[in-house]
Amino acid sequence: MGVALREVLTEYKHPRTWETLAGTAAIDGNNALYQFLSIIRQPDGTPLMNSEGRITSHLSGVFFRTLRFLEKGIRPVYIFDGKPPALKQETIESRREVRREAGVQWEAALARGDQEEAYKQARASSRVTPEIIATSKELLTLMGVPCVQAPSEGEAQAASMAASGAVTYAVSQDYDSLLFGAPLLVRNLTVSSKRRVQGRTIAVQPESIRLDEVLGGLGITREQLIEAGILIGTDFNPGIRGVGPKTALKIVKKDGFADMIAEKLPDFDPSPILQFFRSPPVIANLSLDWQPPDQAGIEDLLCGEYGFATERVRTALQKISGPPGQKTLDRWF
């Protein structure tokens, strides 16, 4: 879910066209997979599956979104979460319970014929399993796209790569990337121009947020941004009741973070969270290698193993590796 900073970041969001985003993008892989599993579903909430009952929603999302990236001159690198920090355990347990309850409500809605509620609850029950991650990595490898297994938080790894210049920007729907120090965050980088938010469909377009512009505009340091995040609540702590983004900013700008914690949460030590955002476990000096797609391998996986329509897969691949004279992938590899 990430830190709830949207309210104070609105004026720093800049609409972008796909054409202006050519470059190398570090994609929050787990975040992307969750989106695919949530959105790519049948009207009653059932995920897309092959004849054997194996979920294919994530593979469809990975395949077509990645092709769209490449077609638009974006070289993606998918970053996957490693071992979650102990700080996150409470959040993980809470999310697991939310998914479990959503699954129960999904079944109940189906039983009473309430398709709209069933779809809503099905989305909330989405779960990224080890098999889903493994098959996504397999597909990306066949597509010639590098995958990075982060030692801990994928967003932290993506932010580090953006800060070092290994990639042009980080891609995630969450704002944690800014707390981790990503100089440029891009959101809404999706194939569809629509998203479902709180039960309704809205039009969206890619947008970028520059960390230096945010800090300068708000008149704070990155350290104070992290402090504000902790006051509001992060994946590692619940925050202080009644403290939203605007109040949190006022507090940190007056150097009141420590006093507020001492007053409201006397038994809470924010030091481990501060340190984790400042210096999370990441892999430095990565060597990224893009390769031409293995069309036969892609067809074997998607069509042979998962039942995708062969013609649809071939047509999609043709868009980026088409006949002579057309734009091809060669310039990227």
Swiss-Prot record:
Annotated segments matching region I-domain: 117-256
Listed EC numbers: 3.1.-.-
Cofactor needs: Mg(2+)
Domain of life: Archaea
PROSITE patterns assigned to the protein according to its UniProt record, in alphabetical order: XPG_1
GO annotation terms (biological process): DNA repair; DNA replication, removal of RNA primer
Region of interest (N-domain), ranges: 1-99
UniProt GO MF annotations: 5'-3' exonuclease activity; 5'-flap endonuclease activity; DNA binding; magnesium ion binding
Pfam family of the protein (one): XPG_N
Cofactor binding description: Binds 2 magnesium ions per subunit. They probably participate in the reaction catalyzed by the enzyme. May bind an additional third magnesium ion after substrate binding.
Keywords: DNA damage, DNA repair, DNA replication, Endonuclease, Exonuclease, Hydrolase, Magnesium, Metal-binding, Nuclease
Positions bound to Mg(2+) 2: 174, 176, 235
Region (Interaction with PCNA): 325-333
Biological function: Structure-specific nuclease with 5'-flap endonuclease and 5'-3' exonuclease activities involved in DNA replication and repair. During DNA replication, cleaves the 5'-overhanging flap structure that is generated by displacement synthesis when DNA polymerase encounters the 5'-end of a downstream Okazaki fragment. Binds the unpaired 3'-DNA end and kinks the DNA to facilitate 5' cleavage specificity. Cleaves one nucleotide into the double-stranded DNA from the junction in flap DNA, leaving a nick for ligation. Also involved in the base excision repair (BER) pathway.
Family, as annotated: Belongs to the XPG/RAD2 endonuclease family. FEN1 subfamily.
Subunit annotation: Interacts with PCNA. PCNA stimulates the nuclease activity without altering cleavage specificity.
Name recorded for this polypeptide: Flap endonuclease 1
Organism, as annotated: Methanosphaerula palustris (strain ATCC BAA-1556 / DSM 19958 / E1-9c)
Lineage, top ranks: Archaea, Methanobacteriati, Methanobacteriota, Stenosarchaea group, Methanomicrobia
